[in-house]
Design a protein with these regions (language model features):
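Short, compositionally biased, intrinsically disordered N-terminal export/targeting signals
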Residues: 1-85, 152, 169-172, 502-529
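N-terminal, intrinsically disordered, small/polar-rich Type III/flagellar export signal
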Residues: 105-224
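Short helix-loop boundary/capping segments
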Residues: 209-249
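Generic "edge-of-domain/loop-turn" microfeature
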Residues: 154, 166, 177-181, 231-235, ...
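N-terminal "first-domain core" detector
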Residues: 61-129
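A eukaryote-biased signal for long
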Residues: 20, 242-529
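Short, flexible helical or helix-coil boundary motifs
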Residues: 41-49, 60, 73-84, 101-112, ...
Length: 529
């Protein structure tokens, strides 16, 4: 896109009219809506000022088009839209708009609507073409991002950003009640998080940057929901996000496959320190990378899955600390207990790659990749002195893929038997880890860990279309640990006050914590005995 200098942003871009004969104007009116151009006035808002016309691709148009606005206004949102409309990418079109819409609540708690469409020069205001383009932009199902926020008082705020080649539209609607001043302030605080989420979704390829939408005061805002649909390689990519005081969920579906991550915030007793959570997230992201490598998963799907897992598990510590302060008599984990858990809130996460059949000679040989992982915990007992904690982690991988017999020769399978030289791999893996902790009258009586891992690898080898081998390799391992004798003396040191004693305690507990995570590789698990 050609860079524009000295673009006036004090008011929406002023249309520039060029003189043409009647036949040229008629031809312009019949231009396809798919061909879009924008007129940008340089050096000021005066219509007589010099102007340059650019198409959305950055090339000089064969037919002039000028922007037409729903409402004439020089407010911050409209001014930003005027500057963005000359860009072609979704990210540039939506740049800053999400934050600007939420920041409106600083001075205005009412509804707001604005749209701009590119029309052939000379098209009269209110024409059927303008009405159609504006309606198409508002109704756009792709390249659209919406945010719904329900406040603690019951009011609902809906924000929508829509884009198509010839139109850009934004809307704010407040319903089901009036916003309090405190709620308006809470909405403003989400502005940066909303814009960061938009920037990630509108990027190419899309990414998930949603943690800013999880940072809200639940005493003022009851829930936050985001829905997005964007085009990726000519196909639709959808993203749905929800957060409230009890749960967080994100799901996505697109050309590469589907994913979903849910985090349960109803059992905050198990949540550890921010440092412990950071280490746990790092461990899980490494497991996702290992699963992708072993199962040949789609890189873009796994990258988005990792984003989703990290974002949904962010900013949980503050909520846990607040809950602990509000309910000090409830059962809470001490340092020794936390050393045998991940420190994460309970979750379930899954991703499934789009199935393909790359071998026309054997169409039942599909390339697949499916991965699930979860954590579930239970805290029980009649009080802190008689508490019991269990935490179960699981993961499952199922995958299949084709591979060339020669690493440096790309696989191109056809019905010709000369192309049928390959191996077909089928992977099935399972792993689990269960920690159990129990107290009787304040005395630790149980601290155990049971882990298991199994892997099955089936490889069928074909040469000239004939299967010459079919081999299945199973691997299994189990491991049981008892930490009772190790934890009992450490538990007595939890009241340590000297820096040296605290450091020794933390190091010892970190050593135990290092062992509680899932270990999907049976050989590695077996070596830890």
């Amino acid at each position: 896109m050609t860079n524009l200098s000295a673009v006036s942003t004090s008011v929406p871009v002023t249309p520039v009219t060029t003189t043409r004969n009647a036949s040229a104007q008629s031809a312009a009116s019949n231009q396809s809506l798919a061909q879009s151009y924008t007129s940008v006035t340089l050096g000021g808002s005066n219509a007589a000022a010099s102007a340059q016309l650019y198409s959305m691709s950055g090339t000089a148009p064969s037919t002039d088009k000028t922007p037409s606005w729903l409402n004439k206004s020089n407010d911050a949102v409209s001014t930003m839209m005027a500057g963005n409309f000359s860009s072609s990418s979704l990210g540039a079109r939506f740049k800053g708009l999400g934050a600007a819409l939420l920041n409106r609540f600083d001075s205005d708690a009412g509804n707001f609507s604005q749209s701009v469409v590119a029309l052939p020069a000379g098209t009269p205001k209110g024409s059927a073409l303008e009405t159609t383009l504006r309606a198409q932009t508002d109704a756009q199902s792709d390249n659209k991002i919406s945010l719904t926020i329900v406040t603690a008082s019951g009011a609902q705020v809906d924000l929508t950003l829509s884009n198509q080649e010839d139109g850009l539209s934004v809307q704010v609607q407040v319903s089901k009640g009036k916003l309090t001043d405190a709620e308006r302030g809470a909405l403003q605080k989400l502005s940066d998080g909303f814009q960061t989420a938009i920037d990630g979704i509108a990027a190419s390829p899309p990414s998930l940057k949603l943690d800013g939408l999880t940072q809200f005061d639940t005493s003022l805002l009851a829930s936050v929901d985001l829905h997005a649909s964007v085009q990726v390689g000519g196909q639709s990519q959808t993203i749905d996000f929800h957060a409230d005081s009890k749960q967080r969920t994100v799901s996505a579906a697109g050309p590469a496959g589907t994913l979903k991550v849910s985090v349960d915030l109803s059992n905050l007793a198990i949540v550890g320190t921010a440092k412990q959570q950071g280490e746990a997230i790092k461990r899980y992201l490494k497991q996702f990378d290992d699963a992708q490598s072993r199962g040949h998963g789609d890189a873009s799907l796994v990258a988005m899955f990792k984003d989703a897992f990290k974002e949904m598990n962010s900013n949980v510590t503050n909520a846990a600390q607040q809950a602990r302060a509000q309910s000090p008599a409830a059962i809470w984990l001490n340092k020794a207990d936390q050393s045998m858990t991940t420190g994460l809130a309970d979750f379930s996460a899954s991703m499934t790659q789009e199935v393909t059949s790359p071998n026309p000679a054997r169409q039942n040989e599909n390339d697949t990749f499916s991965y699930q992982t979860s954590q579930s915990s239970n805290v029980s007992g009649n009080g802190q002195l008689n508490r019991a904690i269990t935490q179960q982690q699981e993961s499952h991988l199922s995958a299949s893929y084709h591979e060339s017999l020669l690493a440096d020769v790309p696989l191109r399978l056809t019905t010709d038997k000369n192309s049928q030289n390959y191996t077909y791999h089928q992977i099935k893996d399972d792993a689990s880890s269960k920690a159990t902790i129990a107290y009787d009258k304040g005395v630790l009586v149980k601290a155990s860990l049971q882990q298991s891992a199994s892997q099955s690898t089936r490889v069928q080898k074909y040469i000239m279309g004939e299967m010459i081998s079919d081999q299945t390799t199973p691997q299994n391992a189990t491991l049981s640990r008892d930490f009772l004798d190790l934890l009992k003396p450490l538990q007595k040191k939890e009241g340590a006050t000297s820096a040296a004693d605290i450091s020794k305690l933390d190091q010892a507990l970190a050593t135990i914590n290092n062992l509680v995570y899932l270990q999907p590789d049976p050989l590695t698990l077996r070596s830890e005995r």
